[in-house]
Amino acid sequence: MSVLPVIYTDLDGTLLDHDTYSAEAARSVLERVGAGGIPIVPATSKTYSEVVEFRSSMNLTHGFIVENGAALYVPVDADIRCPMGSKLFDGFWVREFGVKRQALCDVLEALALGSSYRVKSLTEMRSSEVADITGLDLASARRAQQRLYSETRDWRDRGAALPAARDARTRIEVRAVMGGV
């Protein structure tokens, strides 16, 4: 059995410019690595829709990891075995490691009952509001809203509310990751 190199990379602030979301500065490196036959596997907080768009724009053809490790997508025509426990979706073998978004939303909604947390979900917002908050164009904002495994929220509270919400999530084993800073 031979060992082949693989490059795993984040997107935000790595291949994508933190302020403009452009990958143009990385294009020539991606092309050279791709020409050498080395797979580039993005591992990101981005959604399936966002990564599919990125892969297309950068001519990437290998697998990818979405929503902070919630799922692995491997093209069905890849020269590797189908990941155990995977299902077929849109030309990819998908191995899910996280819960579906709706199950998470149900837990988060129950958690918020009786509280006065000021928070708004990305999927509850208009796409134009997401674009304003994130700096994304409208089409990119829509792709960012197409979450399958995680729920991005705009936290609008201050003071003791954040530690209280964190403690409540910890009790039910829901992990939150702060992004966008």
Describe the predicted segments one by one.
Residues D19-T20, V76, P163-A164:
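Short, glycine/acidic-enriched capping/hinge loops at junctions between secondary-structure elements
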Residues D17, C82, E173-R175:
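A sequence-level detector of short linear motifs
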Residues E24-S121:
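Active-site phosphate-binding/coordination module
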Residues L111-V181:
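Conserved acidic, metal-coordinating active-site core of Asp-based
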Residues I7, L72, E151-R153:
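Well-ordered beta-strand positions enriched in small/hydrophobic/aromatic, beta-favoring residues
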Residues V3-T20:
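Asp-based phosphoryl-transfer active-site loop
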